[in-house]
Amino acid sequence: MVFAAPIVAAFFYKPTKFNNYGDIYQPARPVANLQMQGANGPVELDSLRHQWVFLAVADGVCNADCEGNILKTRQLRFMQNNDMSRIRSVFIHTNLAPDLAADLAAKYTPVEVYAVEADAYKKWTEILEIPDAPTEAQYDRFYIIDPAGNLMMSYPPSADPNLMKKDIKRLLKASQI
């Protein structure tokens, strides 16, 4: 009886609070393929699989929160030290002026900058929505896509990079992909 008690307790225990800082998408959402245009020609989003993807997105304009997220994708990747090679930093946009996109790519190297057609972008970003969140909380977020191509976490623009780093360290340690 004493030996069975922990097993029975674990079966009925349902935690309501987790140790993560970001918003987890449960279940993880498969990310659809997306045709993108990079500086070196067309690229498919599926080609980014098999690595973690830190993602920032913008529709039309890249405001201060957008640029902050691009910077976070780069900085958080660098913060991972030896695990940096397991991560790609990506910025997907639509309707940005080509010279602005090129400036962002140069300013935030090695972040990969890709343009997407407006209709495809609008349909594709439906997956990014967070249920029951206010409208303003839906945009200008920092997203994490796992190596299997699933959207699994996001952070608001005001997120503390040090707390984000802890989440990411845990993810990378647990996945070993």
Residue positions per predicted region:
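N-terminal "domain-start" segment that seeds a small globular fold
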Residues: 8, 12-46, 67-68
